[in-house]
A protein has these predicted regions:
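A glycine-rich, hydrophobic/aromatic-adjacent loop/helix-cap motif
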Residues: 1-190
Length: 190
């Protein structure tokens, strides 16, 4: 699959008949939404976990030196905590550009803190996209992150801001926090 998924996502029509749609955010949407929303509240999806396995040559890296950004990967016992944003479908025009580098809009069930649930959409980069980097040791991911900068800024800022946002929400994520620890160690070693 091409790294540019805008055309594929425009064909996602499952929610076209709705005035509003829930969007699940688990990465940069936690610290930099950058779009209009009607409501925002904590949510989670089951069976998925965060991983820095997606390459970024359009935001946090370049084609010659891609950064690493989050995607979700399936894991049966996992729960990914994040934020649900209630948006108007027109917002997807903006989001499809932001998430064009290999991310597909997929329908998932979102669980809320009050026990209720709703169908919604989440952007997930799958292994068949051209920007996929895949699994690597946390220290190697941190080294790549530390060396990468793109139009949206240093890749390290993405990791640090995400870790801060997760802590502010009371969420723990060993993958994100492990990469953050390796980044700080690299900075101390200087």
């Amino acid at each position: 699959m091409s790294a540019d998924t805008r055309a594929v996502n425009r064909q996602m029509t499952a929610f076209d008949d709705r005035d509003t749609v829930w969007l699940f955010g688990y990465g940069s949407l936690l610290f930099k939404a950058g779009f209009d929303y009607l409501e925002c509240r904590p949510a989670r999806i089951h069976g998925w976990t965060r991983r820095f396995w997606q390459g970024s040559h359009d935001h946090r890296g370049t084609p010659q030196a891609p950064g690493r950004v989050l995607t979700l990967v399936q894991q049966d016992d996992a729960i990914c905590e994040g934020m649900a944003y209630l948006i108007a479908p027109r917002v997807f025009d903006q989001l499809d550009v932001r998430e064009k580098n290999g991310y597909l809009r997929l329908a998932k069930t979102l669980q809320f803190d009050d026990g209720s649930a709703a169908d919604g959409l989440v952007y997930i980069a799958t292994p068949d996209n051209a920007a996929w980097l895949g699994e690597a040791p946390l220290a190697d991911i941190a080294a790549q992150v530390a060396a990468s900068t793109g139009p949206s800024g240093p890749n390290r800022d993405y990791v640090i801001h995400l870790a801060e946002a997760l802590r502010a929400l009371g969420y723990a994520d060993s993958h994100v926090f492990g990469i953050e620890r390796h980044l700080h160690a690299l900075e101390r070693a200087g």
